[in-house]
């Protein structure tokens, strides 16, 4: 049992260190982005399958889209990082019910992703600060409070926006846009 606790704490510490490194790299423009064309539908299916295997909740994990495929210019590993973070966060606050990842084509230029859960939701007074560093909805929940800050920086770097849907009251809904084609400004690669 002691070994399990040490292992778990080691993993949490490593995650915290990696989050701090990611945050610093993003803030100073040092994080490498490898932009290429990827099928966002396939990425969403893969992420949903992955999180479904490790989730520690009875909530049903779903992926919804009307699209057969949607090729976007992105850094697929960073897109997966954002999606996994949002889905894992949802599992922490949704003991049962459902968590739904949805992908839509908002326009010819923009994809729209959302993660909706039927959990406890985020109080209105916390919504404005939820993307700040070290902000946590539940101080007792595992995590560093850096994940949403990192998600925001990644999404902004690739030319999108991320927000909480303030009108959804059945839990919480995080929404973000992602350009289908990268422009010169948001696809530049850092050295």
Language-model features, listed with the residues they occupy:
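Short alpha-helical segment of the dimerization/phosphotransfer core of two-component systems
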Residues: 8-13
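Short alpha-helical Gxxx[C/S/T] motif in the catalytic ATP-binding
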Residues: 147, 151
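Short helix-loop "hinge" at the ATP-lid/N-box region of the Bergerat-fold HATPase_c
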Residues: 90-91
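Helix-loop junction within the histidine kinase core
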Residues: 24-35
């Amino acid at each position: 049992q002691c070994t399990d606790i040490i292992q778990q704490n080691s993993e949490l510490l490593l995650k915290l260190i990696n989050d701090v490194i990611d945050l610093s790299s993003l803030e100073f423009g040092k994080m490498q982005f490898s932009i290429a064309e990827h099928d966002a539908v396939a990425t969403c299916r893969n992420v949903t399958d992955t999180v479904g295997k490790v989730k520690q909740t009875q909530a049903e994990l779903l992926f919804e889209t009307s699209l057969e495929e949607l090729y976007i210019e992105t850094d697929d590993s960073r897109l997966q990082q954002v999606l996994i973070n949002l889905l894992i966060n949802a599992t922490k606050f949704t003991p049962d019910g459902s968590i739904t990842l949805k992908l839509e084509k908002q326009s010819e230029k923009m994809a729209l992703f959302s993660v909706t859960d039927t959990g406890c939701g985020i109080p209105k007074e916390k919504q404005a600060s939820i993307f700040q560093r070290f902000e946590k909805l539940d101080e007792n929940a595992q995590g560093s409070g850096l994940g949403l800050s990192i998600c925001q920086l990644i999404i902004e770097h690739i030319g999108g926006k991320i927000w909480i849907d303030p009108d959804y009251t059945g839990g919480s809904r995080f929404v973000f846009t992602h350009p289908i084609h990268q422009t010169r400004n948001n696809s530049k690669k850092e050295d």
